[in-house]
Structures are given as structure tokens and as C-alpha cells.
């Protein structure tokens, strides 16, 4: 049993191996046959092209050589023989190299001249027997329409010229007419195919021009882009304004009590430098901080040619006025000061502290006397060019500062129960400001009345 099974296994293995070898051998043979066929076809094609080209060149050279007598007859016979060989071995147009590559070609008269692709296709068409034997390709309607317009009588001159100048057409005409085709069919097929060839050339030329135009349009116009770039106006950098810088400058100028100052330019014209409208100060307020309205001054725009920001040193009289007003307001609003929380001083508390240090030297009585005198003087002189003066203090909480100085104010009081509103008319404010600039002294009674 075991020996029978082993023999069966070896037999099946040998059969499988033989079958595999047979299949591989068959594939290899087919591959070799295909390669040999392709190689033979290429060799035949190249040989035919070489023979045709050589025959044409030899024929051309023999035609150019001048001879006489028997030598001329021999050379003429050889030339005719080579011409027949060239026509026989010349491949058809669909099996030749692209006709666009041909730049030199022998003419029917025996000369060589540079020809374009259209003339090369025309000569190939003339030497092809299928041009005259086979029916034209394409729809029959086109052929019938063309035949209705074609007249063989009008082409007699051209036919005679072709028979005289083209040996290939003359040889084919002699062989085919009237054995294979009639005279009219021969020339109708020839002229129709020439007509189709001309249409193809026109179509090819149109496509070529369209491609050239599209390539030309896709090229970037660097000159136009450069002109557009040069024609662009630059950004008006001189008119650029920075709102954040203006707000910071206006806040610092208002806190210092800035007043419009008059300067003289190089040309001698006087112009005023005014702070812009006071914007809300950016800072880190404390937990119980509230808004504090400061003094804003707006001059007459018609009398000021140039308005600029100024953050430098301001007159001391104007700064003292704002500081004294803030100090008086804070003293009235904070009868019961409360110690601030350590480590959280606010920006609004530090600025009034500086003001309170200066007012502590002068004293409240001097402030009151100056305010009274200023009010009386301005009532007589009338309003000046200052138009708006506001002092709204709805939250002015003052407490002793961390260093214990008198009059320092903070905004962290929590038990403030009373709001202090100071309402003044526009005329009273203008009179008070003008009086401070003129006299600089106020009385106690007028200060109390003014409050």
C-alpha cells in the first residue's frame, strides 16, 4: 500500500513538473516569435526606406551629370531603373516616418529642394496607387457635393502639366487607364484627395495659430504689472493717527491739569497746543473704584490753526487749581476715612495723593480766598474763550495712604453712604478759571458760597 501511494505521488509530481515546463517553454517561444517578427518588420521598413533614398540620390546625381552618346543612354537606363526601384520600395504614407521631418526631397524634374510638410504629403499622394484605385474616404455626401462643383474641362491644363512634370503620375496613369479605372475617375479621385489634403492643411494651420495665440496670452505681462505698481499712490503716512497714544497723552495731560499754551513757530505765527477730549484712562482699578470726572477744557476751534498733543510740563497755576479742587472735593466726601487694604494701591489713588501733598502746604483757607477773588473779577470782565467746564465727582473716596501722609486719597472705601454732586453753570466755571489766572487769591466766604 505504501509503495503504491509513493509511486502515485511521484507520478503526479512528474506530470505537474512536465506541465509547468511545457507552459513556460510555450510562453518563451511565443515571446521569441513576437520579438523576431517585430525585428523583421523594422529591418524591412528601414531597408526599404534606405533603398528608396539611395535610389533617389543616385538618380539625382546622374541627372545632373552632363553626358553624350552611348554613355548618356546607359546612364539614362540606369536612372530609369533606379526610379522604378524607388517607386516600388517607397513605403506608403501611413507606414513612413512623419512627413514633417522630411526637409529635402527629389522633385519629379530630378532636382532636390527644401519642401514643407504640405508638399511632402502631396508628393506621397501622387506616388501612391491607392489614390487612384480606391474610393475616397469620408461621407459620400461630401464627394457628391464636390463633384457637382468640379469640372474636368477646367483642369485640362493642370492635367497636362502633371503628366509632363511628374513621372510617378505618368507611370500610374499609363498602367491604370483604361485597364483599371476610367480617365474621369482617375482624375476625379486625384483632385478630390488633393482638395481634402488642402482642407487638412488649412485646419492644421488654424490650430497652430490658435495654439501660438493661447501661449502668447498666457505669458505674464510684467510691464503692465510694473506700470500699475508705479501708478499706485503711497499711503498717507503723515496722516496716520494712533488712537491709543492720543488717549494716553490726553489722560496724562488732564491729570496734570494741562492748559492750552501758546507757542510761536519759525514764521512768527502763534498757535495753541491743546489737549484732546479726555478719554477714559486705562488702568487697573481697585475693587471699589468708581469713575472720577476730571476737568476738561476745550478752546475755540476757529481761533486755533493747529491742534497737537503735549505731555510736557504745564503751568503751575493751572495744575494747582485742579489739585485744589480735587482735594476740596475729597475732604468733603470722606469724613470717616478707612484704612486701605495692604498691597492693592490703585492708579487713581496714587495720582490724587500727589495733589494732596501740594495742597497741604497752601491750606484750605488760601484756596477758598483765591476762588472767591477769581469769581468776583471774572463777573466784571466777562467770559473768555473757554467754553466747557465740568466737574462731576460722584465717587471720591479718600482715605489715608500707606505712608500716612495727610490728604492722600484712595478709592477702596466700602462704607460711603453719600454722593456729592457739584453743579455749576458754564458762566460760573469760566469766571472761576479766569480769576485764578488773573488774581490767584480766593476768600473763605466766596469759596463756601461757590460750593
Curated annotation (Swiss-Prot):
Extent of Low complexity compositional bias: 275-295
Domain of life: Eukaryota
Segments forming domain BSD: 146-198
Biased composition (Acidic residues): 412-424
InterPro entries on file: BSD_dom, BSD_dom_sf, BSD_domain-containing
UniProt organism field: Gallus gallus (Chicken)
Disordered: annotated segments: 252-296, 309-424
Protein name per the record: BSD domain-containing protein 1
Listed Basic and acidic residues bias regions: 365-388
Lineage: Eukaryota, Metazoa, Chordata, Craniata, Vertebrata
Polar residues composition-biased segments: 309-320, 392-411
PANTHER family recorded: BSD DOMAIN-CONTAINING PROTEIN 1, SYNAPSE-ASSOCIATED PROTEIN
GO cellular component: cytoplasm
